[in-house]
Design a protein with these regions (language model features):
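Active-site microenvironment for binding and transforming phosphate-containing groups
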Residues: 1-144
Length: 144
């Protein structure tokens, strides 16, 4: 059986999807929408979920954050997290680092576009799949 869980319409909020696999072969998924109004409570709930490490073999985490367009050193325009301090606080609350098991996806926050306003979904089947903006992510260890 396949189960799906999602959040959408982030419109400036942050969302996190966590897929955990356990020693017994079972899997779990957690999707959370972080409102700036109750950030402290949201981080507390997230911390509680992330500290349940009993029997976890692997964990994949995707964080969607509001983004902003900047010009990088090569002169290319790229989208980066708008508030790196909030992202760092969230990663710290979950006892995570911005490494290969954590993928950060900044999304554009504009009033004129419905697409790209923050959709995050987990499909939990034989092989868990995470989607951002309805696009399947490659979460293998070799991805960049």
């Amino acid at each position: 059986d396949t189960a799906k869980i999602a959040t959408f319409g982030l419109c400036g909020c942050t969302a996190v999807a966590v897929v955990s696999e356990y020693l017994d072969g079972s899997k779990s998924a957690h999707v959370q929408h972080f409102s700036p109004i109750c950030q402290e409570l949201s981080e507390s709930v997230f911390r509680s979920v992330m500290t349940k490490n009993q029997g976890v073999v692997s964990r994949k985490v995707v964080v969607m954050v509001p983004g902003q367009w900047v010009q990088n050193g090569d002169g290319n325009t790229i989208i980066v997290p708008k508030d790196q301090a909030s992202l760092n606080s969230l990663l710290q609350a979950g006892n995570l680092s911005d490494d290969n098991s954590v993928k950060v996806y900044p999304y554009r926050v504009t009033s004129g576009h419905r697409y790209g306003q923050g959709t995050l979904m987990v499909e939990l089947g034989d092989e868990p799949v995470i989607y951002t903006e309805c696009i399947q992510l490659n979460l293998t260890k070799s991805s960049s």
